[in-house]
From Swiss-Prot:
Gene3D superfamilies: 3.40.50.920, 3.40.50.970
Binding site for Mg(2+): D151, N180
Source organism of this protein record: Bradyrhizobium sp. (strain ORS 278)
InterPro entries noted in UniProt: Dxylulose-5-P_synthase, THDP-binding, Transketo_C/PFOR_II, Transketolase-like_Pyr-bd, Transketolase_BS, Transketolase_C, Transketolase_CS
EC number in record: 2.2.1.7
Protein's UniProt name: 1-deoxy-D-xylulose-5-phosphate synthase
Source domain of life: Bacteria
Keywords: Isoprene biosynthesis, Magnesium, Metal-binding, Thiamine biosynthesis, Thiamine pyrophosphate, Transferase
Catalytic function, reaction form: D-glyceraldehyde 3-phosphate + pyruvate + H(+) = 1-deoxy-D-xylulose 5-phosphate + CO2
Length: 641
């Protein structure tokens, strides 16, 4: 029986050069097949879904009109880049998305020449694009630079900083605003499409430039009035572009991002413009072409594997509550007793558990958008007025507000409470989203209390501890995913500041854990016991202030002391070693080792596989103990077998 391909035209396209050989009448079919291929692929792998479906036509049109990769195409964030990957020589690997050794879920320079700039954090595309445009001009090049940015990413100040700079420099840069939340655009239609083609066309631009040159020779009053007439007439017919025009961009739009008859001529006109920065405002719909995603854009922003026919996602039943949910629920319980508690998120309410708090206390919840710098200083302002702000931000995104943490929070010792989600390795999102550095970048700051939860019950108590800390900033870090399934306390109880806890008492080896590697320490201790080695286990709880009494006791009572953490060099282990060195404890016979993440950016995989490669699982800990003892782990394992 003969089988027919569902994507016959797409099958002929290996690179955008193949796409550009097609007749314009065939582009619509390519887009339809590209959408089907995207749906099929993500149903197998999971990943970011809705945004990619929303830019299928735009992606096809850009690669059809522009000479990529000579023309530089930069995708902001990269959530929407799956169709782009399919068209740019990576279709044969698209079903390896976000898996070990497979394609990245974001754009990545090392992966393809069609990814000239990597992304995963938002609002960077215009800055990068401007840098590339200036480099082109300095080198005498003629290629285009296109930055595609979503309206959500336009909530970050960096995007406007870049646009302001681009407008002042008058560099030839094309910014495509992908407005998929209707947060900026008025209704689009035939008149808007016609005007966009008119205003992006060479005739209008030539007349406009000629009028500007004429205006330079007219009396100032007349020239100013003529300029205002042109501006007002464009504003009257094309509502929405005034802000961008004020920043120095030539505004075109809004146009229907799913109508290729509108997109193609406008992009061709824009491609052929020779001066100045241009913003093309394109309106799209998240999840376009897949009805479940169209109906529930929030649920299909990022998905697990799913059944195409029903849209049902294959999510495993959790064995324990997710850490972000434990945080959200704990914060609600504390806020029921304290009306000064408020919750802050930077556009990640469900990811951080702040959505749970928002349902209970909508007026005490603040989603500031993709604006981590603002979120931190906003929290500082609330703290200065006696409120108790909980600023819940992923570890990787908190990096974006670092100066504010130093200058606005720590120097003033304001009691902002940082809930640092996604601490440690996060798996499929890879290096760009790993929470590897907060131990190091917060640990060097005076006045900061730093905690790490070893399990979900500890997180409940640490939230209560943060409520009680009212004279300085504090942070608690916890990972992505489920807890351990431990018994949960009814209420959180504030912990003694700077005090850890002993989990197991042994003799020869001390394992001092900071964070959720405690479970691996317990497994390692069991294996060491099978080899005849007695191991103590301690949960540090606090990195700052350090439990000096506990650290000294472990150092004095054991031959080997090993610290274990889910962070980079310069973190918890460095603090322990610094203290022991100051106390002269490293001058004698103590064998001290610090187990941290490797000093490299790890590619995406499952968290378990990534931690195993880093040597931060139970086997890695046991191997480290044998290494310190001068024994071969493999040989010892054979003896035990």
């Amino acid at each position: 029986m003969t089988t027919f391909s569902k994507t016959p035209l797409l099958d002929t396209i290996k690179t955008p050069e193949d796409l550009r050989r097609l007749k314009v009448e065939q582009v619509r079919q390519v887009a339809d097949e590209l959408r089907q291929e995207t749906i099929d692929a993500v149903s197998v792998t999971g990943g970011h879904f809705g945004a990619g479906l929303g830019v299928v036509e735009l992606t096809t049109a850009i690669h059809y009109v522009f000479d990529t990769p000579r023309d530089r195409l930069i995708w902001d964030v990269g959530h929407q880049a799956y169709p782009h990957k399919i068209l740019t020589g990576r279709r044969d690997r698209i079903r390896t998305l976000r898996t070990g050794g497979g394609l990245s879920g974001f754009t990545k320079r090392a992966e393809s020449d069609y990814d000239p700039f990597g992304a995963a954090h938002s609002s960077t595309s215009i800055s990068a694009g401007l840098g590339m445009a200036v480099a082109r001009d300095l080198s005498g090049g003629k290629n285009n630079v296109i930055a595609v940015i979503g309206d959500g990413a336009m909530s970050a100040g960096m995007a406007y900083e870049a646009m302001n700079n681009a407008g002042a420099m008058n560099s030839r840069l094309i910014v495509i605003l992908n407005d998929n939340d209707m947060s900026i655009a008025p209704p689009v239609g035939a008149m808007s499409a016609y005007l966009s083609r008119l205003y992006s066309g060479k005739t209008y631009r030539t007349l406009r430039d000629a009028a500007k040159q004429l205006g330079q020779h007219l009396p100032k009053v007349i020239a100013n009035r003529a300029s205002r007439v042109e501006e007002y007439s464009r504003g009257f017919m094309m509502d929405g572009g005034t802000l961008f025009e004020e920043l120095g961009f030539y505004y075109v739009g809004p146009i229907d991002g799913h109508n290729l008859d509108h997109l193609l001529p406008v992009l061709k006109n824009v491609r052929d413009m020779e001066t100045g920065p241009i913003l093309v405002h394109v309106v799209t719909q998240k999840g376009k072409g897949y009805s479940p995603a169209e109906a529930a854009a929030d649920k299909y922003h990022a998905v697990a594997k799913f059944d195409i026919a029903t849209g049902t996602q294959a999510k495993a039943k959790p064995n324990a509550p997710a850490y972000q949910n434990v945080f959200g629920q704990s914060l609600v319980k504390e806020a029921e007793k304290d009306e000064k508690i408020v919750g802050i998120t930077a556009a990640m309410p469900s990811g951080t558990g702040i959505d749970i708090f928002a349902k209970a206390f909508p007026k005490r919840t603040f989603d500031v958008g993709i604006a981590e710098q603002h979120a931190v200083t906003f929290a500082a302002g609330l703290a200065a007025e006696g409120y108790k702000p909980f600023c819940a931000i992923y570890s990787t995104f908190l990096q974006r507000g670092y100066d504010q943490i130093v200058h606005d929070v720590c120097i003033q010792s304001l009691p902002v409470r940082f809930a640092i989600d996604r601490a440690g390795l996060v798996g499929a999102d890879g290096a760009t989203h790993a929470g590897s550095f907060d131990n190091a970048y917060l640990g060097c700051l005076p006045n900061m209390v730093i905690m790490a939860a070893s399990d979900e019950a500890e997180l409940v108590h640490m939230v209560a501890t943060q409520v009680a800390i009212d004279d300085r900033p504090s942070s608690v870090r916890y990972p992505r995913g489920e807890g351990r399934g431990v018994e949960m306390p009814e209420v959180g109880v504030a912990l003694p500041i700077g005090k850890g806890r002993m989990i197991r008492q042994g003799k020869q080896v001390a394992l001092l854990s900071f964070g959720t590697r405690l479970a691996e320490c317990e497994k390692a201790a069991d294996e060491l016991a099978a080899h005849g080695l007695s191991a103590s286990i301690a949960d540090a709880r606090f990195m700052k202030p350090l439990d000096e009494e506990l650290v000294l006791k472990l150092a004095r009572d054991h031959e080997i002391l090993i610290t274990i953490e889910e962070g980079s060099i310069g973190g918890f282990g460095s603090h322990v070693m610094q203290y022991l060195a100051d106390q002269g404890m490293l001058d004698g016979g103590l064998k001290m080792r610090s187990m941290v993440l490797p000093d490299e950016f790890q590619d995406h995989d499952t968290p378990a596989a990534m931690y195993a490669r880093a040597g931060l699982d139970a086997k890695g800990i046991v191997r480290k103990v044998f290494e310190v003892l001068g024994k071969d782990y493999a040989a010892e394992a054979v003896k035990l077998a």
